[in-house]
């Protein structure tokens, strides 16, 4: 992470002394500009900051010495339940927002419960509707390797069809739970 976070803090993510689950200017050592949480305010803030940056540049309100900034937000899938995010997306579409990247961690987990199964099929569609270019990075190298093995396509289909409630339970149970479910099915 460009030298802003230690390996130790990342390995102890969400643990005592580890990196926080939500960016925090008071608890993290990196250069977080907008703290966020489960209400999605920091996510929307990046979009509006990009719009304001363009406005200041176009109206020549600054001295022009600052390079154009990039607004990047790391978003949990559960945050997509917040209405202000969709209001922000619509405003971004109306004002042709630029220099903005949102990385959505679709991990099917939420501190408030299990993420709705129907959400995954709509996420990309919602962003594309308001003019975003969506790049999906769904599987890691280990899964891609497993999919290339005999019966790998069946594994891919099983993972894709797995309801979020079962997926969350298996994540909690760990490797033994996954092996039992995959062997059974």
Identify the residue ranges that each predicted region occupies.
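Cofactor-binding active-site loop characterized by glycine-rich and histidine/acidic residues
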Residues: 1-95
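Short internal beta-strands
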Residues: 99-107
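Long, well-ordered, tryptophan-enriched scaffold segments
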Residues: 106-185
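Short glycine-/polar-rich loops that comprise or flank the Walker A/P-loop
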Residues: 69, 96-100, 131
